[in-house]
Curated annotation (Swiss-Prot):
Family matches, as SUPFAM superfamilies: 4'-phosphopantetheinyl transferase
Keyword Lipid biosynthesis among record annotations: yes
Organism listed in the record: Lactobacillus helveticus (strain DPC 4571)
GO biological process, one term: fatty acid biosynthetic process
Binding site for Mg(2+): D8, E58
Name the UniProt record assigns to this protein: Holo-[acyl-carrier-protein] synthase
Root EC class: transferase
EC nos: 2.7.8.7
Domain of life of the source: Bacteria
Record-level Gene Ontology MF annotations: holo-[acyl-carrier-protein] synthase activity; magnesium ion binding
Disulfide bond residue pairs: none
GO CC annotations on file: cytoplasm
Length: 118
């Protein structure tokens, strides 16, 4: 049974400005494993990754019906890749199945998350 659906978007230009300021925002938003992946990236890919992970966490919190804040924090949600390069999302705040989707172009990053109860 579907528990929730969340969608979010962020402008690439906004993320570029954040990345240019250094790693403090990335360290706040990304889990240690996500941050380790982020540090290996450069340029456009780094912007897409940070923006995508931020937006996925927003989408997850919307699907939970809480938004980011008191119940769901940045460190409660992690998205890594499986062996085929698909995003795999886990959370300490939800025990069911999580289906993330992400797309981006030169202007926008859009994410979508579906939560399914077990």
């Amino acid at each position: 049974m579907i528990k929730g659906v969340g969608i979010d978007s962020i402008e690439v230009e906004r993320v570029k400005k954040i990345v240019a300021k250094g790693d403090s925002f990335a360290e706040k938003v990304l889990t240690p494993k996500e941050f380790a992946q982020y540090q290996k990236m450069k340029g456009k890919r780094k912007v897409e990754y940070l923006g995508g992970r931020f937006s996925l966490k927003e989408s997850f919190s919307k699907a939970m019906g809480t938004g980011l804040g008191k119940y769901v924090g940045f460190q409660d949600v992690e998205t890594l890749w499986d062996d085929l390069g698909h995003p795999v999302m886990t959370s300490t705040k939800f025990d069911g199945n999580i289906f993330p989707s992400i797309t981006h172009d030169n202007h926008e990053i859009i994410t979508f998350v579906v939560l399914e109860e077990k």
